[in-house]
Amino acid sequence: MREIVHLQTGQCGNQIGAAFWQTISGEHGLDSNGVYNGTSELQLERMSVYFNEASGNKYVPRAVLVDLEPGTMDAVRAGPFGQLFRPDNFVFGQSGAGNNWAKGHYTEGAELVDQVLDVVRREAEACDCLQGFQITHSLGGGTGAGMGTLLISKIREEFPDRMMATFSVVPSPKVSDTVVEPYNATLSVHQLVENSDETFCIDNEALYDICMRTLKLSNPSYGDLNHLVSAVMSGVTTCLRFPGQLNSDLRKLAVNMVPFPRLHFFMVGFAPLTSRGAHSFRAVTVPELTQQMFDPKNMMAASDFRNGRYLTCSAIFRGKVSMKEVEDQMRNVQNKNSSYFVEWIPNNVQTALCSIPPRGLKMSSTFVGNSTAIQELFKRIGEQFTAMFRRKAFLHWYTGEGMDEMEFTEAESNMNDLVSEYQQYQDAGVDEEEEEYEEEPLPEDE
């Protein structure tokens, strides 16, 4: 079986991770102690992708929980699914990174990283045929951003041929937790561009919007936001966890989604977005799902794909769906909105089907898009970064941990390069290349 090892780092990562495990335990018929009491053979068939089987019909998540302070871990352990995880897989420090990327990446985090790698190695050795790693973290803080990216690069060194998928919570434009978010995020993106294979960008503000606009929650809690993220994570990994007609895995997703190795930052969406209690009142159809899935309001990152073009995108449908209907709808979307898809990648929409819907729904769909509009997100962080870096504001927190200003400059220019690469492919057309070919034979006439 193709196993995935899951890492969660920092406060944000651990809370999203906990929500994710809660969601998929439910889908696989496990209770909060990991004991199987499901009804369907299909739940067991690929259980081993995320769970190790222990004695007595108990399943243990293949998860490594990392933080530089004990607080969040204790909360996870005390939470409803705290008894699910293997106690040895909690790795935590005492000091905290204090939202300082340098602490997470170079000082505090670097002291803890070998301990984490031992646990990762142990989990990897228990695998039959390891497919890759997934990591949940935020890019604005210290531990998730700094230590998360450190772990990614260390794992990359040790397992160079395995997939690395990250679910990264990007700082949002209006909702900010700390003043140094732009620094931490820029330094993290600098690492992710090089070391991750696929990064799913999630953004608190977009999640807030979805909760308020679509789910009509007047003051959403982080629990509600994490519930949305876990729905997407569960959707992206459905194909790996259940048999289906058209399966895809992390590597297939990457092959279909990443036209150029650096451009692997995806927007994600989920449909049907209904509040937790309302879904039982109406039937969902494939056309509705498709329409909702391609709706900018459903995107979990604060950038509007109407300002860019899709290089590629992938739709994962779950439930009793007719293959033909899905194909027709997807073709329909591409024909109607052809201006939003680049024309030099034919067939750039990939679909996958899985016959088992999420709990409480008849059918659902998860959307993953590689759109050039994601550059808005990097531009925004870049502008905030420049505004502070120009004045060298707050830099002493980083240089004090042994960082160099050069590193900041490098990270900044790497992110600017990323933005201009996206822009370049957004503007590229088919006709430009044809002109080049016509001009080539000219010198022979002389």
UniProtKB/Swiss-Prot annotation:
Keyword Cell wall biogenesis/degradation: no
CDD domains, A to Z: beta_tubulin
Source species, domain of life: Eukaryota
Classification via InterPro entries: Beta-tubulin_BS, Beta_tubulin, Tub_FtsZ_C, Tubulin, Tubulin/FtsZ-like_C, Tubulin/FtsZ_2-layer-sand-dom, Tubulin/FtsZ_GTPase_sf, Tubulin_C
Cofactor requirement: Mg(2+)
Acidic residues: bias regions: 429-446
Keyword GTP-binding: yes
GO biological process: microtubule-based process
Coiled coil feature spans: none
Binding positions for GTP per the UniProt entry: Q11, E69, S138, G142, T143, G144, N204, N226
SUPFAM superfamilies reported for this sequence: Tubulin C-terminal domain-like (SSF55307), Tubulin nucleotide-binding domain-like (SSF52490)
Residues where Mg(2+) binds: E69
Molecular function terms from GO: GTP binding; GTPase activity; metal ion binding; structural constituent of cytoskeleton
Ranges where the record places region Disordered: 423-446
Localization: Cytoplasm, Cytoskeleton
Role according to the record: Tubulin is the major constituent of microtubules, a cylinder consisting of laterally associated linear protofilaments composed of alpha- and beta-tubulin heterodimers. Microtubules grow by the addition of GTP-tubulin dimers to the microtubule end, where a stabilizing cap forms. Below the cap, tubulin dimers are in GDP-bound state, owing to GTPase activity of alpha-tubulin.
UniProt record similarity statement: Belongs to the tubulin family.
Subunit structure: Dimer of alpha and beta chains. A typical microtubule is a hollow water-filled tube with an outer diameter of 25 nm and an inner diameter of 15 nM. Alpha-beta heterodimers associate head-to-tail to form protofilaments running lengthwise along the microtubule wall with the beta-tubulin subunit facing the microtubule plus end conferring a structural polarity. Microtubules usually have 13 protofilaments but different protofilament numbers can be found in some organisms and specialized cells.
Protein's UniProt name: Tubulin beta chain
Gene: TUBB
